[in-house]
Amino acid sequence: MSAILSADDLNDFISPGVACIKPVETLPKNESSNSQNPYEVTTEDKVQPENLPPAQISLTDCLACSGCVTSAEAVLISLQSHAEVLNTLDAYPELPLTQNHNGPYTGSSDALDGESRIFVASVSPQVRASLAATYGISEKEATYMIDQFLSGPHGLRAGGKHGSGFSWVVDTNVMRDAILVLTADEVSETLKEPSARAISKDTLPKRPVLSSACPGWICYAEKTHPFVLPHLSRLKSPQALTGTFLKTVLSKALGVPPSRVWHLAIMPCFDKKLEASREELTDVSWSPLDGGVPLTESNKPVRDVDCVITTRELLTLASSRGISLPTLPLKSLAPSYTPHFPDETLNAFLFRKQNGSEQSMEAGTSGGYLHHVLKTFQAKNPGSEIVTQRGRNADVVEYSLMSPGGEPLMKAARYYGFRNIQNLVRKLKPARVSRLPGARVPAASAGGNRRQPISRNSASAGSGTDYAYVEVMACPGGCTNGGGQIRIEDAREASTSTQSVTAVENPSKPTPHEQRAWLARVDEAYFSAESDAEAKWTVRHSPSPSLRGRLGSMKLSSIGLT
């Protein structure tokens, strides 16, 4: 590790201290009126009203403070956890849905007047891969396991105060496919001349465009390197876009406020909790979409995602209800537990049938943003070739799209892990003028003879700007190695099959070799996931006209589908 890089730079989390850096002001205790001297003068700062309500500091307050909390894992885990899921399921009954003759579902009038909720969930492919590796099952069977647990009769619906479960469980890959197309369009616009751009300069990121789907990377950039913020992609992550899509569509189709749609996201990392807590990812951006339907039942903002739990917390959630995940039926749910989405086109879009094609290993384990950008530009340049050059380690890879004549058409890169991100940030950092005596100076400029010193970093600074796009992820190895994934130690305890975890039967602490083997096992499950070839729907260019028509007056640009 470089001497410039300290251990503190690799961890952006600071544990909350005993005293908050921005404490709530408290007034001195009011003395009893009997003991006061009637002629005594009391200053204003010693007067305290009776029966003051207790002071409260929310998660949003902590994150906005930027003082003692950065990634705020301790606070996030306590506020967004399996306990929050159980408390919500027990606090609100599930909204009963009835099907009309023409197909769409609507809630009963009695239920709409009560406190019932529509429970929906979204699951990332990395979560399914982790479960598949843990229990020695296929990725498809892991999907069945999650569906049975969240929506089936032997899962969450088998217990709790109201027997509530999740009406729909959505794969985040669906919205990811839409974001892949939008990412390629965004990069394409930045490469055009300003006069030829269809999007205004203010809404476009600077080159190179940096991916914005990883909240750990975003938190790090905001806290320590704000100069890279103009380079961040303007697109939402699949988690946030899925929440926006579900809440807007269900609210409009069922005639309920978005606040009555409760969205749980199951993700591979804890920082996704931080993302869900951001003020920007609320109904502020999409509230005008639901004309006529009351947006909220209070003045509180409606979040895209109400709660995030990780893969490990999913195991804890099952354990809290006394449910063993491996004992659940590894088959699709009965039709009575899988209601159609309130629109046939959207139902086919969200719950598309899968075939046996595999995901490309070239796309990586973090969504394939960079891979899709490269393939899109290669398709626009017939005969071109993608040349790969590995960096100092496997988490740094540079890509060049070469013309048939050997000329570079575009460059892109992948940077995973904070150690490598430090090097990327150093390349993007603006050159700083050196004020040291004896520094080299350039020749006099055309405007005069004033001599300017040259920064010693000027040669390397800005060398990363020749990239068109950079896929940046905080976790080494990508999202399958997220901090919330099932660890090899957890897999030993959770597994009930002797074949589920190979070569790790020794109960001692796993060696680095065993940890790498375990990550490779999760990656194998991820890449073997059955994807839908026709699922590329018409996402290669734009959302289908039929989808636009079904969404009617909804502004697709507001939810990232255009």
Swiss-Prot record:
SUPFAM superfamilies reported for this sequence: Fe-only hydrogenase
Binding site for [4Fe-4S] cluster 1: 20, 62, 65, 68
A GO term, aspect molecular function: iron-sulfur cluster binding
Bias type Polar residues, positions: 29-40, 452-462, 494-505
Pfam families membership: Fe_hyd_lg_C
Disordered: annotated span: 28-47, 439-462, 492-513, 541-562
Function: Component of the cytosolic Fe/S protein assembly machinery. Required for maturation of extramitochondrial Fe/S proteins. May play a role in the transfer of pre-assembled Fe/S clusters to target apoproteins.
Family: Belongs to the NARF family.
Protein name: Cytosolic Fe-S cluster assembly factor nar1
Organism: Aspergillus flavus (strain ATCC 200026 / FGSC A1120 / IAM 13836 / NRRL 3357 / JCM 12722 / SRRC 167)
Primary gene name: nar1
